[in-house]
């Protein structure tokens, strides 16, 4: 039987891949910088995760079906969801970017009240969000800007 990784924090995920945590509630990840990788993992998400898959480096089982994704698409998971990943490359670093955030980040916000309405966080939708090249560039720019903000630490007011 394989171990289930209960992801209750972004720090847990970062430690599994040897990535740095700059903020306990949100993390921009670059799996090209991973120092560890798992050939197989069963994830139980307690956080939100959006991955921009720049290559197809693993097979993903989501709920009871395979997740349909390809290079250049976004794969999304929400708290309470399970996914299994099986690596299909022998490299530690894979070409994927993403953002992980704890549900507490959304407390008291309008997004926190409406995020469950977004169908890309639903088991019924087992297909990744397909993006144009321009949309991929926008996502990568946004992740870069968020990462820069995280590197500056907490503002003192």
Task: Report residues per predicted region.
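Short aromatic/basic micro-patch
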Residues: 44, 76, 100
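Residues immediately flanking
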Residues: 55, 79, 101-103
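Generic protein-terminus/edge-of-domain signal
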Residues: 1-61, 65-67
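Short acidic-glycine-tyrosine-enriched beta hairpin
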Residues: 64-78
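A hydrophobic/aromatic-rich effector-binding and dimerization subdomain
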Residues: 16, 20, 88-152
């Amino acid at each position: 039987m394989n171990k289930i990784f209960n992801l209750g924090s972004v720090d847990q995920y970062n430690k599994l891949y040897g990535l740095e945590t700059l903020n306990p509630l949100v993390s921009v990840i670059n799996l090209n910088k991973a120092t560890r990788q798992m050939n197989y993992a069963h994830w139980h998400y307690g956080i939100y995760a959006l991955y921009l898959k720049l290559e197809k480096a693993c097979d993903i089982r989501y709920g009871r079906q395979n997740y349909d994704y390809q290079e250049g698409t976004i794969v999304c998971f929400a708290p309470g969801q399970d996914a299994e990943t099986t690596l299909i490359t022998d490299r530690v670093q894979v070409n994927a970017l993403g953002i992980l955030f704890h549900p507490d980040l959304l407390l008291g916000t309008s997004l926190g009240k409406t995020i469950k309405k977004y169908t890309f966080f639903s088991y019924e939708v087992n297909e990744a969000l397909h993006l144009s090249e321009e949309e991929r560039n926008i996502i990568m720019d946004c992740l870069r800007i968020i990462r820069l903000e995280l590197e500056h630490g907490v503002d003192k007011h």
